[in-house]
Amino acid sequence: LDASTYTVSAADGSDKFVLAFNCTNAKLKDKRVRQAIRYAINHKEIIASRGNVDYALGGPIPSVDPGYEDLTGLYPYNVDKAKELMKEAGYTTDKPLRLTLTYANTYGTELGDQLKSQLAKIGIDLKIDYVEFSTWLQNVHANGDYELSLVDHAESHDFYKWTTPDYYYHYDNKNVQALYAKALAATDEADSAKYLKQAAKAVSEDAPRSE
């Protein structure tokens, strides 16, 4: 390429690797379990294994969308805290919680292997179910039949998914829905972003997923 004609640049995008928790699943209704999983995930280790081309979000809104805030500080990597929460919920490494992670084999096996290893440290026996993407679309996305799921959501401005209980997350939080409604109704962009930021933080604190 002629450097005087073409310029190559890199920028943030809207892609979000989402580890989703089925909020209607009996095992995952316990917020302590969801929080423990958040604390137990070593994002730096996972990102390093992928060539350090990604970064942790900590929340449901990417940096290119209105309402973004770095929420990684809500659940920093803390195995001891994760173990404490799991013990409160009735699980230990000697009495593990068994969960299944379902995700498309197009993403390879490394992510699943890393999560299995990391969660084993806090008393979670994670089974990995690698499926064809078409199977994931039918079983997880369409039917909501899963416990944990991992997928790259590339859509921008898609916070509405966290306000739609019928979406495969099965997440139902009236406060989040009310804040999102205020964001949509706001006539000022700054006000809209403020409500989105509040809603995103509420979602992240509730721990129905990890990014």
Where are the regions that the model predicts?
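Extracytoplasmic/peripheral linker and loop segments enriched in polar/acidic and small residues
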Residues: 127-136, 160-211
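Ligand-binding "clamshell"
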Residues: 1-9, 143-146, 158-168
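Extracytoplasmic/secreted proteins, especially bacterial periplasmic and envelope-associated proteins
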Residues: 32-36, 41, 45, 77, ...
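Extracellular/periplasmic solute-recognition and catalytic clefts
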Residues: 1-24, 148, 152
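Second-shell loop/turn segments in exported
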Residues: 22-27, 33-36, 67-75, 103-105, ...
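Periplasmic-binding protein-like
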Residues: 24, 28-65, 110-111, 203-211
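Ligand/substrate-recognition segments at binding pockets and active sites
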Residues: 87-155
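Structural transition elements
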Residues: 55-88, 108-110
